[in-house]
């Protein structure tokens, strides 16, 4: 089920259940997960994209294994807030994924999440090679943490 607002998403979630955050890219999907109290987002892994069926199988395996109740998908809006082709692609991915699972799905504005993740990794003195390996799932954690903070204040 796709929830257009965070309020609708919150109403669809069972209490004390973990969430997943996704940073959807052309080549990779960054994945982060929350604790059951929905306080902290933790980077989990980066999935190399192949085709939708394989990507969805990998994501749904994580959802099942970690008992995820909701998915927060980063929505790559333009800096002026408008939606371009990447937003349309992300919404299409969500529609296709929602056909395969009953898990609630919502969107979170991901503008500058990768920039914030890159900055944090630079401050942690991470090597360039290591940054390229973890940037997507660290960005997913930034996306998920933003949504968790909003959910906490509803």
Curated annotation (Swiss-Prot):
Family classification: Belongs to the YqgF nuclease family.
- State the organism of origin: Ruegeria pomeroyi (strain ATCC 700808 / DSM 15171 / DSS-3)
Q: Report the EC number(s), separated by commas if there are several.
A: 3.1.-.-
Listed GO MF terms: nuclease activity
Q: What is this protein called?
A: Putative pre-16S rRNA nuclease
SMART domains, A to Z: YqgFc
Q: Subcellular location, in the record's words?
A: Cytoplasm
Q: Which Pfam families match?
A: RuvX
Q: What is its main location?
A: cytoplasm
Keywords in alphabetical order, please: Cytoplasm, Hydrolase, Nuclease, Ribosome biogenesis
Q: Which CDD domains match?
A: YqgF
Cite the HAMAP family for this sequence. Answer: Nuclease_YqgF (MF_00651)
